[in-house]
Amino acid sequence: LDAMQRVAASAPGGPLLIVAGPGTGKTRTLTHRIAYLCAELNVYPEHCLAITFTRRAAEELQHRLEGLLGPVAEDITVGTFHSVGLTILRENAKTAGLPADFRIADDTERAAARAEAGDDDAAYVKLLRAADLVDLDELVSLPVALLRDHPELVERYRDRWRWIFVDEYQDVDATQYELLRLLSPPDGNLCAIGDPDQAIYSFRGADVSYFLRFSQDFVDARLVRLTRNYRSSAPILAAAVQAIAPSTLVRDRRLDPARLDPGAPLVGRYPAASVTDEADFVVRTIDELVGGLSHRSLDSGRIDGHTSNVSFSDIAVLYRTDAQAAPIRDALARANIPVQKRSHNRLRDLPGVAAIARELRHADGLGGSVAARVRLAGQVLAQRYATPTLDTTSGVTPEDIWTAVDVLTPLAHRCGDDVASFLSQIATGAEVDALDPRAEAVTLLTLHAAKGLEFPVVFLVGCEDGLLPLRLPGTTPTEAEIAEERRLFFVGLTRAQDRLYVSHVRRRLRHGQERECVPSPFLDAIDAGLFERLGDSAPRRPKDRQLRLL
């Protein structure tokens, strides 16, 4: 640990807020803090509760704690807000007015209840309860209501979880915040970690003001800042800090590069004539990097000073809206470059996923690995949807099924033979949770889905006014909305380790018509000296690209 990480990890009890900028070792600091408390201060592991926002983050936390503490790490409760809420409801089902064997409603059940109830939420809940079901979105609000009405339960859980750790605290919403306030007294041992400049989820109800008022909510709260960045090169960090400066929520915002590399490349900036030109630029540059065939091959020396070639899995293309992915994906496909694409949408909303989940539930008696069963379900369903019958009016196509199989397979492998775990991850996870980090493919992600990930090479495409910041026709974004878009831009820039390219086009088809575009105003905040202008003298694409890549 570095000096400030050590200060954070070994802080005494009481409320603690850790402001951890991108790439500053947030998870490492959090796990070392928990390990320090258990190993050095004799805190019982069963008194610790660590809450994350995604299952992927929870798994990573659990895995690292096992590495630090060994078998006793199993006694620490690590989970998402949803899974903690579910635990509280399972343990107090009767008090909460639920049957002991209540289930989370699947998509079909939710859709049926919604169709019958219309917009009447009370009727919708009543229909679910009649079938012993709970909506996924109630997994936090129901425990909050339960604890509010039963002070003795509040005491019981405060006694059980005397030490609470919350990751990504800038993303909590009003209900999650209330749950934390119920579980942790104002002078309690609550450790919150995050970065308000990465608060990008207001559309989901997240409210960064809870992070900003931590010291008012909790008595004598300590504040520790982590500013040493282990991820990105100095030019990338300089650009990112300048980009966020106009609306930063962190006083004296800084990110100090731990990597000292005087030869680190500047941020590549490509002004494209069209969307096709932009996609060709991405393909051409990937070809140069992966083939290592030109002076532009990535020789920033990835720490050890040797020229290193890049593989497809080292590369990500990020964009503001999912619609921007198609031309990039098509251009990569034409060049035979493998791709995996993910968004921040819920897994269960992807066409085909619900059908596969239903098939697995019905075929519950079958054994075998989840991955094999997903593939089998895919074959059965693809055939069923290929022959139109009266009951296949769902609009799901065989292509949807195979796309869903591709997206779900990495997740299925991680679940081994545990179908129940797989189904619950489908219910609560986002598409990006099913990303396969080992896949030898270029990753295409929305900026929201990219949060928390890192790649040696990043392309941030579509840096135009109207896309970044996003503006829908006929609307004027508020100051707060523009500030959040700037934070999203900051998140995108700080995903890059060695190489960062930003691009913008002169003309783009948006909302059904071709429009003139101007570069994003966010680029203006970055010193021109940090950019390398590309494209003014870019070599034309060699004709033999396909052969070289094969």
Where are these regions (language model features)?
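Short, polar/flexible loop-turn hinges at active-site or ligand-entry regions and domain interfaces
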Residues: 42-47, 67-76, 92-106, 126-132, ...
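Short glycine-/polar-rich loops that comprise or flank the Walker A/P-loop
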Residues: 43-47, 74-75, 186-189, 195-197, ...
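Acidic, low-complexity intrinsically disordered tails
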Residues: 532-550
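Helicase P-loop NTPase motor core
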Residues: 24-30, 34, 220-222, 229-337, ...
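Conserved helicase C-terminal RecA-like lobe
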Residues: 311, 325-333, 350-530
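P-loop NTPase Walker
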Residues: 1-98, 131, 155, 238-241, ...
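Conserved beta-strand -> loop -> alpha-helix junction used to position metal-binding or nucleic-acid-contacting
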Residues: 73-88, 337-359
